[in-house]
């Protein structure tokens, strides 16, 4: 779920 924070 790191992708969500990378947005």
UniProtKB/Swiss-Prot annotation:
Chief location bin: secreted
Activity regulation as described: Inhibited by diisopropyl fluorophosphate (DFP).
Intracellular or extracellular location(s): Secreted
A GO cellular component entry from the record: extracellular region
Catalytic activity: cutin + H2O = cutin monomers
Keyword Secreted appears in the UniProt entry: yes
Record's comment on post-translational modification: The N-terminus is blocked.
Keywords from the UniProt entry: Hydrolase, Secreted, Serine esterase, Virulence
UniProt EC number: 3.1.1.74
Additional facts recorded: On the 2D-gel the determined MW is: 21.7 kDa.
Described function: Catalyzes the hydrolysis of complex carboxylic polyesters found in the cell wall of plants. Degrades cutin, a macromolecule that forms the structure of the plant cuticle. Allows pathogenic fungi to penetrate through the cuticular barrier into the host plant during the initial stage of fungal infection.
Listed name of the protein: Cutinase 1
Organism: Colletotrichum kahawae
